[in-house]
Structure formats: C-alpha cells, structure tokens
Amino acid sequence: MSTLVPYVIEQTGNGERSYDIFSRLLKDRIIFVDGEINDMSADLVVAQLLFLEAQNPDKDISLYINSPGGSVTAGLAIYDTMQHIRPDVQTICLGQCASMGAVLLAGGAKNKRYALPSSRVMIHQPWGGVQGQAVDINIQAKEIVRLKKLTIKYFAENTGKTEKQVAADMERDFFMSAEEALTYGIIDTVMNRRKDG
C-alpha cells in the first residue's frame, strides 16, 4: 500500500507552484520525525537539518516528533546533528515520543521543548536481540550496555536528573503524560490549544 502525501498549491509571481506538504513545511523550517526511526528516516532528517542550517544558521528549526522509537544509532545520528548545528532546534511532541523519540524530544534547545496536551512520552533502556557464537554475543552485549549508558547520560544532561535516577526509571517502560514529562524535565512547556482570532 502506498502512502498518500497531500499537495498544496501556492500562487507565485510566475504562476502556481505545487509542493508536497512536507516540502512546503520545510520552507517554514519545520521537519517531521514520524514513525519508526531507522537509518533511512534518520538520513532524511539529518539532511533537512543540515540544509536549513546552511540556509540560515541563525533561525530556529522546529522538529515535530511522533515516534515509537527505533534504531538507537539512527536516533543518535539525529541527536548529534541537533547538538552540532548552529540553529536552535525546538522539539514538539505530538502523539507520542517513545524510546529514541524521547531522547530527541529532550535534546531540543532549552526552553524550546514542547508537548501537546494529549501526547505521551516513554523512556526505557535500549534493547536488542543477539545470536551467534558466545564471543559475538558478548561483543554485542557490551555495545548494548555502552548505548544504554550513553542514553542515560543524555537524559540526565537534558532533564537535570541524576544518572542514577534516570537509570532506575529506564529499567522498564516508563510512561509519562505531557504534564509528567514537564515535571520530569524532558520538556519545558505543555502547549495550550490555539485560541480563535
């Protein structure tokens, strides 16, 4: 089944121009992280972040996230790029930010991390399945532990919690409402609904 992407039409000095909705939003410096985070989706997000930095390194970028998480290494590629580029990256949770999605949400610029009122956030330790010879399993287990320590470190840095507290909270799936994510320090503001007029 193919994914339908809406198109918008704008009037320009040279007539009409049509854009897929995501390209049109990119013109307004809005990027979406939607669905599972994998190498392909991470490459697209990183490319958009770098493009917008090259276009204007002093103007904020908005990263809207609705993700159940996914590949830790792919998510960390996005996270590291967010930290590396000059523009502030404001993060907005809509729907859910789970696992690596929560790491990205917390990694937004300070005082520019948001969640919509009905959204949820979930943190947990990285997981992975391994198979093979004992020595290979040991190598992969060490890497999973390294990635766990790294995500704990990033959550601690971005929330103000201690690494010990974050590690304890990540032992199992730890779900939070938008208000609870605010109290935890993952976001800075629960967004109110826009008023008419």
UniProtKB/Swiss-Prot annotation:
The active site is at S99 (nucleophile), H124. It is found in: Cytoplasm. It comes from the Bacteria. PROSITE patterns: CLP_PROTEASE_HIS. CDD domains: S14_ClpP_2. It catalyses: Hydrolysis of proteins to small peptides in the presence of ATP and magnesium. alpha-casein is the usual test substrate. In the absence of ATP, only oligopeptides shorter than five residues are hydrolyzed (such as succinyl-Leu-Tyr-|-NHMec, and Leu-Tyr-Leu-|-Tyr-Trp, in which cleavage of the -Tyr-|-Leu- and -Tyr-|-Trp bonds also occurs). This is ATP-dependent Clp protease proteolytic subunit 1. It comes from Treponema denticola (strain ATCC 35405 / DSM 14222 / CIP 103919 / JCM 8153 / KCTC 15104).
